[in-house]
Amino acid sequence: RDKNGKIIAGFYAGRTHSIIANTDCLLGAEENEAILNEVISWMEVCKVEPYDEKTGKGLVRHVLIRKGFTTKELMVCLVINGRKIPQVEKLVDRLQKIEGVTAIMANVNTEQTNVILGKEIQPIWGQDYIEDYIGNVKYRISPLSFYQVNPVQTEKLYGKALEYAGLTGKETVWDLYCGIGTISLFLAQKAKQVYGVEIVPPAIADAKDNARRNGIQNAEFYVGKAEEILPHKYETENVKADVIVVDPPRKGCDEALLETIVKMQPERVVYVSCDSATLARDLKYLTANGYKAERLATVDMFPMTVHVETVVLLSKGEVDSKKIR
Protein backbone atom coordinates (compact mmCIF):
# COMPACT_ATOMS: atom_id res chain seq x y z
CA ARG A 1 0.00 0.00 0.00
CA ASP A 2 1.10 3.59 -0.55
CA LYS A 3 1.24 6.20 2.21
CA ASN A 4 -2.48 6.86 1.73
CA GLY A 5 -3.35 3.19 2.22
CA LYS A 6 -4.12 2.52 -1.45
CA ILE A 7 -3.10 -0.81 -2.98
CA ILE A 8 -0.49 -0.20 -5.68
CA ALA A 9 1.51 -2.26 -8.15
CA GLY A 10 4.71 -1.09 -9.72
CA PHE A 11 8.47 -1.42 -9.73
CA TYR A 12 11.16 -1.05 -7.13
CA ALA A 13 13.02 2.24 -7.14
CA GLY A 14 16.71 1.72 -7.91
CA ARG A 15 18.60 -0.07 -5.11
CA THR A 16 15.56 0.02 -2.81
CA HIS A 17 12.39 -1.92 -2.13
CA SER A 18 10.25 1.22 -2.31
CA ILE A 19 7.55 0.71 -4.94
CA ILE A 20 6.95 3.26 -7.67
CA ALA A 21 3.33 2.83 -8.76
CA ASN A 22 3.06 1.81 -12.40
CA THR A 23 0.72 -0.52 -14.28
CA ASP A 24 1.40 0.47 -17.89
CA CYS A 25 5.16 0.09 -18.39
CA LEU A 26 5.78 0.33 -22.14
CA LEU A 27 8.41 -2.42 -21.99
CA GLY A 28 5.85 -5.02 -20.91
CA ALA A 29 2.93 -6.71 -22.62
CA GLU A 30 0.19 -4.26 -23.53
CA GLU A 31 -2.27 -6.36 -21.51
CA ASN A 32 -0.30 -5.82 -18.28
CA GLU A 33 -2.28 -2.73 -17.32
CA ALA A 34 -5.66 -4.45 -17.68
CA ILE A 35 -4.46 -7.50 -15.73
CA LEU A 36 -2.95 -5.48 -12.87
CA ASN A 37 -5.97 -3.20 -12.62
CA GLU A 38 -8.28 -6.23 -12.38
CA VAL A 39 -6.09 -7.83 -9.70
CA ILE A 40 -5.97 -4.62 -7.64
CA SER A 41 -9.72 -4.05 -8.02
CA TRP A 42 -10.42 -7.65 -6.92
CA MET A 43 -8.13 -7.20 -3.90
CA GLU A 44 -9.95 -4.03 -2.88
CA VAL A 45 -13.45 -5.47 -3.33
CA CYS A 46 -12.66 -8.81 -1.66
CA LYS A 47 -10.46 -7.24 1.02
CA VAL A 48 -7.35 -9.24 0.07
CA GLU A 49 -4.25 -7.72 1.62
CA PRO A 50 -1.02 -7.03 -0.27
CA TYR A 51 2.14 -8.46 1.26
CA ASP A 52 4.16 -6.20 3.56
CA GLU A 53 7.86 -7.05 3.40
CA LYS A 54 8.56 -5.44 6.78
CA THR A 55 5.94 -7.34 8.77
CA GLY A 56 5.69 -10.52 6.70
CA LYS A 57 1.89 -10.10 6.69
CA GLY A 58 -0.52 -9.92 3.76
CA LEU A 59 -1.26 -12.35 0.94
CA VAL A 60 -0.39 -11.07 -2.56
CA ARG A 61 3.34 -10.54 -3.02
CA HIS A 62 3.80 -10.27 -6.80
CA VAL A 63 1.93 -10.71 -10.07
CA LEU A 64 3.93 -12.63 -12.68
CA ILE A 65 2.69 -12.03 -16.23
CA ARG A 66 4.12 -13.89 -19.22
CA LYS A 67 3.09 -13.57 -22.85
CA GLY A 68 3.82 -15.67 -25.90
CA PHE A 69 5.05 -13.20 -28.50
CA THR A 70 3.89 -15.35 -31.41
CA THR A 71 0.95 -17.21 -29.86
CA LYS A 72 -0.35 -14.19 -27.87
CA GLU A 73 -1.10 -16.53 -24.94
CA LEU A 74 -1.03 -14.90 -21.50
CA MET A 75 -0.13 -16.39 -18.13
CA VAL A 76 -1.11 -14.73 -14.85
CA CYS A 77 0.54 -16.12 -11.73
CA LEU A 78 -0.10 -14.60 -8.29
CA VAL A 79 2.78 -15.09 -5.86
CA ILE A 80 1.10 -15.55 -2.49
CA ASN A 81 2.16 -15.62 1.15
CA GLY A 82 -0.15 -18.51 1.98
CA ARG A 83 -1.76 -21.58 0.49
CA LYS A 84 -5.25 -20.36 -0.36
CA ILE A 85 -6.69 -17.40 -2.26
CA PRO A 86 -10.07 -16.19 -0.91
CA GLN A 87 -12.87 -15.68 -3.43
CA VAL A 88 -10.54 -16.85 -6.17
CA GLU A 89 -13.48 -17.54 -8.49
CA LYS A 90 -14.17 -13.79 -8.63
CA LEU A 91 -10.58 -13.18 -9.70
CA VAL A 92 -10.87 -15.85 -12.39
CA ASP A 93 -14.11 -14.28 -13.67
CA ARG A 94 -12.29 -10.98 -14.11
CA LEU A 95 -9.08 -12.30 -15.67
CA GLN A 96 -10.56 -14.80 -18.12
CA LYS A 97 -12.40 -11.95 -19.83
CA ILE A 98 -9.07 -10.44 -20.89
CA GLU A 99 -8.27 -11.62 -24.42
CA GLY A 100 -5.37 -14.06 -24.54
CA VAL A 101 -5.41 -15.23 -20.92
CA THR A 102 -5.07 -19.03 -21.05
CA ALA A 103 -3.36 -19.80 -17.73
CA ILE A 104 -4.09 -18.58 -14.19
CA MET A 105 -2.18 -20.00 -11.24
CA ALA A 106 -0.66 -19.26 -7.86
CA ASN A 107 2.92 -19.60 -6.69
CA VAL A 108 3.33 -20.26 -2.97
CA ASN A 109 6.11 -18.29 -1.26
CA THR A 110 5.69 -18.10 2.51
CA GLU A 111 9.34 -17.34 3.29
CA GLN A 112 10.41 -13.97 4.67
CA THR A 113 12.72 -13.27 1.79
CA ASN A 114 13.08 -10.95 -1.18
CA VAL A 115 13.31 -13.95 -3.52
CA ILE A 116 10.28 -13.55 -5.76
CA LEU A 117 9.14 -17.10 -6.49
CA GLY A 118 8.59 -20.12 -4.26
CA LYS A 119 8.84 -23.71 -5.47
CA GLU A 120 5.15 -24.72 -5.42
CA ILE A 121 2.70 -23.96 -8.23
CA GLN A 122 -1.07 -24.24 -7.73
CA PRO A 123 -3.09 -24.36 -10.98
CA ILE A 124 -6.26 -22.27 -10.73
CA TRP A 125 -7.76 -22.03 -14.21
CA GLY A 126 -6.78 -23.11 -17.71
CA GLN A 127 -3.37 -24.53 -18.51
CA ASP A 128 -0.37 -24.49 -16.19
CA TYR A 129 1.85 -23.14 -18.97
CA ILE A 130 1.80 -21.03 -22.12
CA GLU A 131 3.40 -21.76 -25.48
CA ASP A 132 5.52 -19.67 -27.81
CA TYR A 133 7.79 -20.01 -30.82
CA ILE A 134 11.38 -18.95 -31.34
CA GLY A 135 12.14 -19.47 -35.02
CA ASN A 136 10.41 -22.71 -35.98
CA VAL A 137 10.70 -24.31 -32.53
CA LYS A 138 7.66 -24.39 -30.25
CA TYR A 139 8.27 -24.02 -26.51
CA ARG A 140 6.20 -24.73 -23.41
CA ILE A 141 6.85 -22.09 -20.75
CA SER A 142 6.02 -22.70 -17.08
CA PRO A 143 6.04 -20.01 -14.38
CA LEU A 144 9.26 -21.31 -12.79
CA SER A 145 11.13 -21.68 -16.09
CA PHE A 146 13.56 -19.06 -17.39
CA TYR A 147 12.56 -17.52 -20.70
CA GLN A 148 14.02 -14.42 -22.31
CA VAL A 149 11.65 -11.44 -22.15
CA ASN A 150 12.61 -9.89 -25.51
CA PRO A 151 11.58 -12.49 -28.13
CA VAL A 152 12.68 -10.47 -31.16
CA GLN A 153 16.24 -10.15 -29.89
CA THR A 154 16.22 -13.66 -28.42
CA GLU A 155 15.93 -15.13 -31.90
CA LYS A 156 18.95 -13.07 -32.96
CA LEU A 157 20.87 -14.10 -29.83
CA TYR A 158 20.28 -17.82 -30.31
CA GLY A 159 20.85 -17.50 -34.05
CA LYS A 160 24.29 -16.07 -33.31
CA ALA A 161 25.01 -18.91 -30.87
CA LEU A 162 24.01 -21.42 -33.55
CA GLU A 163 26.21 -19.67 -36.11
CA TYR A 164 29.21 -19.72 -33.78
CA ALA A 165 28.66 -23.41 -32.97
CA GLY A 166 29.47 -24.15 -36.62
CA LEU A 167 27.43 -27.36 -36.75
CA THR A 168 27.52 -29.75 -39.71
CA GLY A 169 25.33 -32.55 -38.37
CA LYS A 170 28.18 -34.67 -37.00
CA GLU A 171 28.78 -32.93 -33.66
CA THR A 172 28.03 -33.84 -30.07
CA VAL A 173 27.04 -30.69 -28.16
CA TRP A 174 26.66 -30.00 -24.44
CA ASP A 175 24.38 -27.07 -23.59
CA LEU A 176 24.96 -25.97 -19.99
CA TYR A 177 22.42 -23.86 -18.06
CA CYS A 178 19.95 -24.90 -20.76
CA GLY A 179 16.70 -23.73 -19.13
CA ILE A 180 13.67 -25.05 -21.03
CA GLY A 181 15.89 -26.13 -23.91
CA THR A 182 15.69 -22.94 -25.93
CA ILE A 183 19.27 -23.08 -27.24
CA SER A 184 19.45 -26.90 -27.06
CA LEU A 185 16.58 -27.41 -29.48
CA PHE A 186 17.92 -24.75 -31.83
CA LEU A 187 21.24 -26.66 -31.88
CA ALA A 188 19.64 -30.10 -32.14
CA GLN A 189 18.33 -29.29 -35.62
CA LYS A 190 21.93 -29.05 -36.86
CA ALA A 191 23.85 -31.40 -34.51
CA LYS A 192 24.19 -35.18 -34.19
CA GLN A 193 23.39 -35.16 -30.46
CA VAL A 194 22.71 -32.49 -27.83
CA TYR A 195 22.83 -32.86 -24.04
CA GLY A 196 21.31 -30.13 -21.87
CA VAL A 197 21.93 -29.49 -18.17
CA GLU A 198 19.80 -27.28 -15.92
CA ILE A 199 19.38 -27.02 -12.13
CA VAL A 200 15.63 -26.19 -12.14
CA PRO A 201 13.51 -29.40 -12.35
CA PRO A 202 10.39 -27.76 -13.91
CA ALA A 203 12.59 -26.27 -16.63
CA ILE A 204 13.96 -29.71 -17.51
CA ALA A 205 10.40 -31.07 -17.56
CA ASP A 206 9.57 -28.32 -20.06
CA ALA A 207 12.74 -29.04 -22.06
CA LYS A 208 11.86 -32.73 -22.43
CA ASP A 209 8.29 -31.86 -23.38
CA ASN A 210 9.50 -29.25 -25.86
CA ALA A 211 11.74 -31.82 -27.54
CA ARG A 212 8.80 -34.23 -27.80
CA ARG A 213 6.42 -31.57 -29.14
CA ASN A 214 8.88 -30.63 -31.87
CA GLY A 215 9.72 -34.22 -32.82
CA ILE A 216 13.35 -33.73 -31.78
CA GLN A 217 14.84 -37.08 -30.78
CA ASN A 218 18.54 -36.20 -30.55
CA ALA A 219 18.33 -34.12 -27.35
CA GLU A 220 18.67 -35.43 -23.79
CA PHE A 221 18.39 -33.42 -20.59
CA TYR A 222 19.78 -33.74 -17.07
CA VAL A 223 18.67 -32.04 -13.85
CA GLY A 224 21.48 -30.70 -11.68
CA LYS A 225 24.26 -28.18 -11.34
CA ALA A 226 26.36 -27.88 -14.50
CA GLU A 227 29.53 -27.82 -12.37
CA GLU A 228 28.54 -31.20 -10.89
CA ILE A 229 26.85 -33.01 -13.78
CA LEU A 230 29.49 -32.42 -16.46
CA PRO A 231 32.54 -33.31 -14.29
CA HIS A 232 30.73 -36.45 -13.08
CA LYS A 233 29.80 -37.52 -16.61
CA TYR A 234 33.33 -36.87 -17.83
CA GLU A 235 35.05 -38.69 -14.97
CA THR A 236 32.72 -41.72 -14.86
CA GLU A 237 31.65 -42.09 -18.50
CA ASN A 238 34.39 -40.17 -20.35
CA VAL A 239 31.75 -38.24 -22.31
CA LYS A 240 32.92 -36.30 -25.35
CA ALA A 241 31.97 -32.92 -26.79
CA ASP A 242 32.75 -31.26 -30.09
CA VAL A 243 31.02 -28.06 -29.00
CA ILE A 244 30.10 -26.81 -25.53
CA VAL A 245 27.62 -23.96 -25.10
CA VAL A 246 27.32 -22.13 -21.78
CA ASP A 247 24.65 -19.57 -20.92
CA PRO A 248 25.18 -19.00 -17.18
CA PRO A 249 23.45 -16.57 -14.81
CA ARG A 250 25.18 -13.33 -13.86
CA LYS A 251 27.62 -15.06 -11.52
CA GLY A 252 29.18 -16.81 -14.52
CA CYS A 253 30.61 -20.33 -14.61
CA ASP A 254 31.94 -22.22 -11.62
CA GLU A 255 35.69 -22.89 -11.92
CA ALA A 256 35.09 -26.65 -11.59
CA LEU A 257 32.99 -26.45 -14.75
CA LEU A 258 35.60 -24.42 -16.64
CA GLU A 259 38.27 -26.92 -15.59
CA THR A 260 36.20 -29.80 -16.97
CA ILE A 261 35.54 -27.95 -20.23
CA VAL A 262 39.29 -27.54 -20.72
CA LYS A 263 39.89 -31.22 -19.92
CA MET A 264 37.23 -32.31 -22.43
CA GLN A 265 38.91 -30.31 -25.21
CA PRO A 266 35.90 -29.42 -27.37
CA GLU A 267 36.79 -27.84 -30.70
CA ARG A 268 34.62 -24.83 -29.91
CA VAL A 269 33.12 -23.19 -26.84
CA VAL A 270 30.23 -20.75 -27.31
CA TYR A 271 29.80 -18.50 -24.26
CA VAL A 272 26.52 -16.57 -23.95
CA SER A 273 26.83 -13.98 -21.18
CA CYS A 274 24.56 -11.47 -19.46
CA ASP A 275 27.36 -9.99 -17.31
CA SER A 276 30.52 -8.59 -18.89
CA ALA A 277 32.52 -8.75 -15.64
CA THR A 278 32.08 -12.49 -15.08
CA LEU A 279 32.47 -13.07 -18.83
CA ALA A 280 35.88 -11.38 -18.68
CA ARG A 281 36.84 -13.49 -15.66
CA ASP A 282 35.84 -16.76 -17.33
CA LEU A 283 37.44 -15.85 -20.67
CA LYS A 284 40.67 -15.17 -18.79
CA TYR A 285 40.59 -18.73 -17.45
CA LEU A 286 39.75 -20.32 -20.80
CA THR A 287 42.30 -18.34 -22.79
CA ALA A 288 44.99 -19.09 -20.18
CA ASN A 289 44.25 -22.77 -20.75
CA GLY A 290 44.59 -23.00 -24.49
CA TYR A 291 41.43 -21.46 -25.94
CA LYS A 292 41.38 -18.44 -28.22
CA ALA A 293 38.53 -15.93 -28.42
CA GLU A 294 37.83 -15.81 -32.16
CA ARG A 295 34.58 -13.87 -32.56
CA LEU A 296 32.33 -11.72 -30.39
CA ALA A 297 28.88 -10.23 -30.88
CA THR A 298 26.65 -8.18 -28.61
CA VAL A 299 22.86 -8.31 -28.65
CA ASP A 300 20.89 -5.42 -27.13
CA MET A 301 18.18 -7.27 -25.21
CA PHE A 302 17.24 -4.29 -23.04
CA PRO A 303 17.41 -1.06 -25.08
CA MET A 304 18.18 2.18 -23.22
CA THR A 305 19.77 0.28 -20.31
CA VAL A 306 23.36 -0.62 -19.46
CA HIS A 307 22.64 -4.34 -19.91
CA VAL A 308 23.78 -6.29 -22.96
CA GLU A 309 24.03 -9.97 -23.91
CA THR A 310 27.35 -11.08 -25.37
CA VAL A 311 28.12 -14.15 -27.47
CA VAL A 312 31.74 -15.27 -27.74
CA LEU A 313 33.24 -18.03 -29.88
CA LEU A 314 36.35 -19.68 -28.45
CA SER A 315 38.36 -22.19 -30.48
CA LYS A 316 40.77 -24.82 -29.25
CA GLY A 317 44.46 -24.02 -29.45
CA GLU A 318 47.52 -25.58 -27.87
CA VAL A 319 46.96 -26.65 -24.27
CA ASP A 320 49.54 -27.05 -21.53
CA SER A 321 48.33 -30.27 -19.90
CA LYS A 322 50.21 -29.42 -16.70
CA LYS A 323 47.82 -26.53 -16.10
CA ILE A 324 44.69 -28.66 -16.06
CA ARG A 325 45.73 -31.59 -13.91
Model-derived features with residue positions:
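Composition-driven low-complexity segments enriched in polar/acidic and proline residues
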Residues: 1-3, 65-66
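Rossmann-like S-adenosyl-L-methionine
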Residues: 87-93, 97-98, 102-325
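A generic beta-sheet turn/junction motif
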Residues: 4, 15, 69-71, 134
